[in-house]
Regions:
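Charged, solvent-exposed interaction patches on well-folded alpha/beta domains
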Residues: 1-41, 50-67, 71-82, 88-232
Length: 232
């Protein structure tokens, strides 16, 4: 081999490459361990109405350590997404010494049961709110479907000048509504058929629906009414 210039050149090239790789790895390790390039600032982007600065600082305190190169960006993101009102967080490095976090908050659409909220994507979360919100309830995993049906039911009753204040999906998967004038409606289990029956009732009721406190729409060709005095 020592008399073969071609093999000697190949060996020399291999050794040079190996030395370069070792130097690169050494430089990377030094950069990761170096006290230089500390993260000096974390900037927060996004429209925040419910998340307090103190909550963000507490979430970041245990996660922002190391330097610009070694800081655990995924860990910072996960810590921010554990805050009650943060739906999604994106975190990136900005040279030379900054992290930038963009936060998206939940937009509460309704209360879910006694202790949770549901956002406009039909996702349940736990967060405090004093807003006057409609109330949803249903089996676990039905949040998205209840949210979607709420939008449609609300659209249907608009001509009556009322709003849907409560949507219930029972354990037997039957739909029930309460309007903001106190009227309750039983819609049955078939949600698509329920929408059709609700449309038919709205057309018939015009603005007289406030005279009734209960409407049973589970009949295929009509509906039953109960008055405030208990008469049908």
């Amino acid at each position: 081999m020592w008399d073969n210039p071609r093999q000697l050149n190949m060996l020399a090239g291999f050794l040079v490459g190996l030395v370069a790789l070792a130097a690169t790895l050494t430089a990377l390790q030094l950069a990761l361990r170096s006290p230089l390039w500390p993260v000096q600032e974390v900037t927060i982007q996004g429209e925040l109405k419910h998340t307090m600065r103190s909550e963000i600082e507490a979430a970041l305190y245990q996660r922002v350590y190391g330097n610009f190169f070694s800081v655990d960006v995924d860990g910072v993101r996960a810590a921010l997404e554990r805050l009650p009102w943060v739906r999604r967080a994106a975190v990136r490095r900005v040279w030379p010494d900054r992290l930038e976090a963009t936060l998206e908050e939940h937009v509460a659409l309704a209360r879910w049961g006694d202790s949770a909220l549901v956002n406009t994507y039909g996702e349940r979360f736990v967060g405090g709110s004093k807003e006057a919100l409609p109330r949803f309830s249903g089996p676990r995993g039905s949040e998205s479907e209840v949210t979607r049906r709420y939008a449609r039911f609300s659209e249907i009753v608009t001509p009556l000048g009322v709003r849907v204040s409560e949507v219930i999906l029972t354990p037997r998967l039957a739909w029930q509504l309460k309007l903001d004038n106190g009227v309750r409606l039983a819609l049955g289990r078939d949600a698509d058929a329920a929408e059709t029956r609700l449309e038919r009732f709205v057309q018939a009721a015009a603005r007289g629906v406030a005279r009734y406190d209960y409407v049973d729409l589970r009949y295929p060709n009509g509906f039953a009414l109960r008055t405030h005095e208990g008469r049908s």
